[in-house]
Design a protein with these regions (language model features):
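Structural motif
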Residues: 140-141
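Acidic, low-complexity central loop/insert segments
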Residues: 1-104
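Short acidic/glycine-rich loop or secondary-structure boundary segments that cap or lie
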Residues: 79-80, 102, 109-113, 152-156
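Glycine-rich, small/acidic residue-mixed loop/short-helix segments
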Residues: 122-130, 144-234
């Protein structure tokens, strides 16, 4: 919060940490649209659309099935929403939500990866995650230069790691041809119901095209590229 306050340019703006004032619930599933409608005046129909109803704010987020994030500012409203969703839904935990984020091609930044990527490497320009028309933030000039003048050499890919062993953000990827050169880093990885780990990774484009990627070493678990739910820029 102290670092964020450095970028407040107007005297009448204040920043305050209100994390403890809200409950956040991730919601996913075809049936959940109907269940949300029982406590909301209207349910967001488009990705990135936001709806408010009393003490509940709901944001629709991209996904292979309907997904929402609910932010609730009152205890009773949170309890009512939870009890409503719990009839046809079930709590599944953070790992399941992170898997859905991975399958949607949405990057999450962790401490281990906070200084590794510029936004374009993590595909943020493809998912409405960064604006080149407005805003002021650290590194803005570098980001804009990459967008308008630079050549992107790394980008984020969806893939599957052929191991049930946990994989972690920042994990290194290698090719069989070069055991010394790190060609990619994991953004996140979570167990997939069909086995192995679903993962997002920022990888050198030339290395990704070679398709002989491995986690941890050139002889580690194979990393097989999948298909993101959105196209790369042409």
């Amino acid at each position: 919060m102290q670092r964020l306050r450095m970028y407040v340019m107007r005297a009448d703006v204040t920043l305050e940490d209100v994390s403890d004032n809200f409950v956040r619930i991730g919601i996913s599933g075809e049936q959940m649209v109907e269940e949300l409608g029982k406590v909301m005046n209207a349910v967001p129909a488009e990705d990135d659309q936001v709806m408010h109803s009393g003490d509940i704010t709901v944001l629709r987020v991209p996904g292979v099935q309907p997904r929402f994030e609910a932010y609730i500012s009152a205890h009773e409203a949170a309890r009512k929403l939870w009890d409503t969703l719990n009839v046809r839904g079930a709590p599944v935990g953070e790992s399941a939500w992170r898997l859905l984020e991975i399958l949607a091609g949405l990057p999450t930044v962790f401490a281990a990866t906070s200084e590794l990527f510029v936004p374009q490497m993590a595909n943020l320009q493809l998912v409405n995650g960064v604006s080149f028309k407005k805003g002021c933030y650290p590194g803005q000039e570098i980001v804009a230069r990459m967008q308008y003048l630079g050549t992107l050499k790394r980008r984020m890919y969806l893939g599957r790691i052929a191991t049930d062993e946990p994989a972690f953000p920042g994990g290194e990827l290698f090719t069989e041809a070069d055991s010394e050169q790190v060609v990619g880093r994991l953004v996140d990885a979570q167990p997939h119901p069909d086995g192995g780990q679903a993962a997002l990774a920022v990888i050198q484009i030339t290395a990704a095209e070679a398709s002989d990627l491995h986690l941890g070493s050139s002889e580690g678990a194979a990393f097989t590229l999948g298909t993101l739910p959105y196209p790369f820029e042409s």
